[in-house]
C-alpha cells in the first residue's frame, strides 16, 4: 500500500523516492502475476462457486467480494452466465473495491446482478475516465432495472489510492476511516440483498 501511494506522489524529490518502491515491487510482481494468471485462477474460481451452490449453499444466498484482481471475477459472476447444473445462478450479488483487469465499459455493461463498487480516486487500474464510465453505466442500469428489484451502486473515495479497502494505513486517520467506510459499504450491500431473498434461494 505504501508503495502504491508512493508511485502516485508528485514533486521532484518523490520521483527519486519512487525508484526504491519500483525496485521493491518488481521483485514481487513476477511471482504474483504468475500465480494470479487467468489460466490458473479461472479454473478454480467458477467451479468453486458452482460446487458451493450445488452443495453446502444449495438453499442459501451467496454474495461475493473482490479486491484488485479479484474484482474481475466478481464482475464476471455478476454477468450471471455461470450456472449450476440445474440452471440456478451461483451468486446473488457482488461487491468490488479498487478493481483491476477490467475492460471498460464493456465488462460493466454486461452486469445484470446487483453490483457495488468502491473506487479509489488515485488508481492506476481505474482511471478517472474509467471511473466515470463505470458510474454512468451502473446509474443507467439502475434506472432501467430498479422496478425489477435490481440496483447497482458506485462510491468514489476521494483522496484514496489503490488498495485502500484492504490495506489501509491505520496510522493515517482519514485513510483508515475510508477503509472502514468501504467495509461498511460491502457489509450493508450484502445485508440488503440477502434480506430480499427467500430462505430457499
Name these PLM-found stretches.
Residues 1-201:
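N-terminal cap/leader regions of alpha/beta-hydrolase-fold enzymes
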